[in-house]
């Protein structure tokens, strides 16, 4: 008897209030790294009706106009009208940054004879994941959820659906049979809109222009449930509808619930923070394991102690899909990937102003040129070391 189950993931658009906060935090991080790549940054953002609060800890030699960066980011997202609840021109922006604690800095900055022995910026555990459900080696539900809100933003920007506004949420439920995606069961899409669009016209346009062009044809079987703006009205949205905070969409940012999460958010954090850099490294490791043909699913856990460079643990789980044992793969990971914090920074070239682009539509599964953690350049080496044939997804 087939093992049949449903699995659901969600995403949110760049105009969702929590994503507005994430993008402001990462825009500030990028501006700082542009001038001083060794800065220590933990930039948190709160946004509400007509108000942005910037707080956190920053130690840098950079001279940054934080208020202007916040306004520019809000403008780029599309909040350029007071009717939307926040307007880049008129919103208040409060700045309250401190410097990084010297107690933390002494552990992070300390170096030994090996200059890669920079300590971790905090304790914690991080996960990376990859699977062969999509060419990008991502779980299908989160991948489709991202593409839906990405298309919503594209049609809003190009004016094809001029009544769209920046805030939107998507949710995709996929039916799995024997562990593989079989069909799409339900799609939910809620989009902010102008007050004069009638609900039937909105629903038809969203289904025909946003949802159907995004779904893979081979997974459209039978009657899919389309739930578009199921409350009936979504005029008030963005930071006016809900207070936005940095770091509140950590499952959207990663694997949509298909893999565990260590709990640490990404946006606004420089790469000395292993919450971010080690999660990126975990994705890099997992993706190369799957691309190498060592397994069709791979979950990586790494953990750290503050001020200590070497991970306190490295774990690999391939859920029974491995062509060699998990113990062998773990050994290969330790041999071929430097998972010390500074080793990760060097391996993935993370001291670059690349982070604002990560802050909407997923940190993983998008093969942008800046996203070094999406490369599969270690796959051939891993396959050769394990004695298996790599998959075709090696780049």
UniProtKB/Swiss-Prot annotation:
Cofactor names from the entry are: Mg(2+); K(+)
Stretches the record annotates as Flexible loop: 100-110
The catalytic activity, as recorded, is: L-methionine + ATP + H2O = S-adenosyl-L-methionine + phosphate + diphosphate
Which residues are involved in binding L-methionine?
57, 100, 242, 273
Give residues annotated as binding ATP.
Answer: 16, 167-169, 233-234, 242, 248-249, 265, 269
Gene Ontology MF terms: ATP binding; magnesium ion binding; methionine adenosyltransferase activity
* Cofactor descriptive note: Binds 2 divalent ions per subunit.
Amino-acid positions noted as binding K(+) in the UniProt annotation, renumbered to this chain: 44
Its Enzyme Commission number? Answer: 2.5.1.6
* Gene3D superfamilies assigned: 3.30.300.10
Q: Where does Mg(2+) bind?
A: 18
What compartments host this protein? Cytoplasm
Report the superkingdom from the record. Bacteria
CDD domains this protein is in?
S-AdoMet_synt
Q: Which PROSITE patterns match?
A: ADOMET_SYNTHASE_1, ADOMET_SYNTHASE_2
Give UniProt keywords alphabetically.
ATP-binding, Cytoplasm, Magnesium, Metal-binding, Nucleotide-binding, One-carbon metabolism, Potassium, Transferase
Q: Could you say which protein family the record assigns here? A: Belongs to the AdoMet synthase family.
- The name this protein carries in UniProt is S-adenosylmethionine synthase
Record the organism.
Burkholderia ambifaria (strain MC40-6)
UniProt gene name:
metK
